[in-house]
Amino acid sequence: MAKVSAVEKNKRREIMVKRYAARRARLKAIVMDQKISLEERFKASVQLAELPRNSAKVRVRNRCEVSGRPRAYYRKLKMSRIALRELGSVGHIPGIIKSSW
């Protein structure tokens, strides 16, 4: 099990990303647009830098929904390899069975 504080911090970051997503996308579009004057682009760049760091999508870590583990994460299932193995072996995940050949 991961530390509860780490999991909660990641949840707060996810909320912050959703809250600032539209504003961040608008400012990034202005910064990247070559047709806009350099002064306006610089102003947008400064505004982008003033946004909270945790509002950047890069700061969010994929974590297992079951255990909170940050590594060995399967995106489709939203869980770690360990949780996948445990839940799959007892039959709690539809379509997942232990292989034998």
Swiss-Prot record:
GO terms for molecular function: rRNA binding; structural constituent of ribosome. Keywords: Ribonucleoprotein, Ribosomal protein, RNA-binding, rRNA-binding. InterPro entries: Ribosomal_uS14 (IPR001209), Ribosomal_uS14_bac/plastid (IPR023036), Ribosomal_uS14_CS (IPR018271). Gene3D superfamilies: 1.10.287.1480. PROSITE patterns: RIBOSOMAL_S14. GO terms for cellular component: cytoplasm; small ribosomal subunit. One of its GO terms (biological process) is translation. Belongs to the universal ribosomal protein uS14 family. Binds 16S rRNA, required for the assembly of 30S particles and may also be responsible for determining the conformation of the 16S rRNA at the A site. Part of the 30S ribosomal subunit. Contacts proteins S3 and S10. NCBIfam families: PRK08881.1. This is Small ribosomal subunit protein uS14.
